[in-house]
Amino acid sequence: MRLHLLKSKIHNAIVTSGDLEYEGSITIDSQLLELADMLPNEKVLCVNNNNGERFETYIIKGKAGSREIQLNGAAARCALPGDEIIIMTFAEIEAEKAKDFKPMILIVDHQNNPKRRHLVGEEDTPLPH
């Protein structure tokens, strides 16, 4: 049996912009992607902390250091610039391996600077801005 588990999360990211005319997706600073163990084209579930809305899309790699979190296409209607969102990826893992699996959590500040990261159940690693 395979279980669908949280793989990684960017916690409390701030939406920086939106582009309704784009084909779809979420553009994320490539440094944040690397720190969060996320990949371009990976499916994400996003939760808007301001209004509770949940939506799915896929990742586009943004410019390193830009701190951009841009919603594109229809997703741009789900959160406005300034809204706080949680971005999550998931993986299918064999039940036996799932017992020991630990997702990566990246915490960012309100300018989307990485503050700290950790595997669930382990100590935080503080990160320089």
UniProtKB/Swiss-Prot annotation:
GO terms for biological process: alanine biosynthetic process; pantothenate biosynthetic process. InterPro entries: Asp_de-COase-like_dom_sf, Asp_decarbox. The active site is at residues 25, 58. Keywords: Autocatalytic cleavage, Cytoplasm, Decarboxylase, Lyase, Pantothenate biosynthesis, Pyruvate, Schiff base, Zymogen. The keyword Chloroplast does not apply. Its cofactor is pyruvate. GO terms for cellular component: cytosol. The keyword Nucleus does not apply. Its EC number is 4.1.1.11. It is an enzyme of class 4 (lyase). It catalyses: L-aspartate + H(+) = beta-alanine + CO2. It is found in: Cytoplasm. Binds 1 pyruvoyl group covalently per subunit. The modification Pyruvic acid (Ser) is found at residue 25. Is synthesized initially as an inactive proenzyme, which is activated by self-cleavage at a specific serine bond to produce a beta-subunit with a hydroxyl group at its C-terminus and an alpha-subunit with a pyruvoyl group at its N-terminus. Substrate binds at residues 57, 73-75. Belongs to the PanD family. Catalyzes the pyruvoyl-dependent decarboxylation of aspartate to produce beta-alanine. This is Aspartate 1-decarboxylase. The gene is panD.
